[in-house]
């Protein structure tokens, strides 16, 4: 299980990303439309003004049950070992174990 502080930190990053999403998108759109390099630099400076944690690249997908940040499956929202345990216990409908 991940530490509670790390999970809360990730939730805080998600809220910041949602808050500054429109500002980032509008700034990127302006940069693509303006041909002048000097004006692009000004807008780029404005793009750097939001907090670092509001960038979407700083977000991590976490396991729904344990909060583990690695080896997550998007379809289920679970980490690999929890997914395996749940499939073996037949708790995930439609998931089958492979055998060959």
UniProtKB/Swiss-Prot annotation:
Keywords from the named record: Chloroplast, Plastid, Ribonucleoprotein, Ribosomal protein, RNA-binding, rRNA-binding
Reported function: Binds 16S rRNA, required for the assembly of 30S particles.
Name of the molecule in the record: Small ribosomal subunit protein uS14c
Domain of life: Eukaryota
Alphabetized InterPro entries for the sequence: Ribosomal_uS14, Ribosomal_uS14_bac/plastid, Ribosomal_uS14_CS
PROSITE patterns: RIBOSOMAL_S14
Name of the encoding gene: rps14
Classification via NCBIfam families: PRK08881.1
Cell compartment(s), UniProt: Plastid, Chloroplast
Cytoplasm recorded as keyword: no
Gene3D superfamilies named among the record's database cross-references: 1.10.287.1480
């Amino acid at each position: 299980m991940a530490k509670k502080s790390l999970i809360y930190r990730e939730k805080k990053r998600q809220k910041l990303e949602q808050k500054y999403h429109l500002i980032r998108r509008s700034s990127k759109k302006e940069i693509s439309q303006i041909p002048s390099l000097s004006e692009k630099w000004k807008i780029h400076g404005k793009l750097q003004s939001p907090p670092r944690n509001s960038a979407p690249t700083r977000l991590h997908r976490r396991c729904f049950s344990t909060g583990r940040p690695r080896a997550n499956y998007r379809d289920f929202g679970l980490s690999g070992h929890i997914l395996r345990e749940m499939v073996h216990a037949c708790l995930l409908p439609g998931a089958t174990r492979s055998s060959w």
